[in-house]
Amino acid sequence: MPLVRYRKVAILGYRSVGKTSLAHQFVEGEFLKGYDPTVENTYSKTVTLGKDEFHLHLVDTAGQDKYSILPYSFIIGVHGYVLVYNVTSLRSFQIVKNLYQKLQEGHGKTRLPVLLVGNKADLSADREVQAVEGKKLAESWGATFMESSARDNQLIQDIFIRVIQEIARVENSYGQDRRCCLM
């Protein structure tokens, strides 16, 4: 019988970057054509990875901006984060940097299980943020970077599989740098 693990993942980013579309495409397998601003929504899906099952509880958040205050519900009990920007919006890329800093301050950790996602890759003709910029930012955080398209269902499954792996990587890394002796 597989081990079932519960993982809560918050999806954060500027407004209209496709956070809801990513979550909906992952869980329901379809693209939402209309835009309805999200206040907060949740999605659930069970994923099998190796011999383990992961029950993912996705928190789809309202769009944040530079001055948004992250509620503790986005920090306490959250195992990992998908930070999303729109490849056609430099502003959304700048906001994601600010969100990461707020998460670090809220957690008080240097290592966070984060996946940086450049969404709307299908609109590359209007691109304002190059993939190399996203990759460089993710590397500076020690995170993984991916570009996706919720409309084209490009790498959607991979995003959420990867965030599960990031959570495990960060959880397993704590304690490796510490040296102590109990007496």
From Swiss-Prot:
E.C. numbers: 3.6.5.-
Chain location of the short sequence motif Effector region per the record: 35-43
Enzyme class: hydrolase
CDD domains listed in its UniProt record: RheB
PROSITE patterns recorded: RAS
Binding residues annotated for GTP, in chain numbering: 16-21, 32-38, 63, 119-122, 149-150
Compartmental location: Endomembrane system; Cytoplasm
Membrane topology: Lipid-anchor
Single Gene Ontology BP annotation: small GTPase-mediated signal transduction
SMART domains membership: RAB, RAS, RHO
Domain of life the protein comes from: Eukaryota
GO molecular function annotations of the record: GDP binding; GTP binding; GTPase activity; metal ion binding
Reactions the enzyme catalyzes: GTP + H2O = GDP + phosphate + H(+)
Record text on subunit structure and interactions: Interacts with MTOR.
PANTHER family associated with the record: RAS, DI-RAS, AND RHEB FAMILY MEMBERS OF SMALL GTPASE SUPERFAMILY
Function, in words: Binds GTP and exhibits intrinsic GTPase activity. May activate NF-kappa-B-mediated gene transcription. Promotes signal transduction through MTOR, activates RPS6KB1, and is a downstream target of the small GTPase-activating proteins TSC1 and TSC2.
Protein name in the entry: GTPase RhebL1
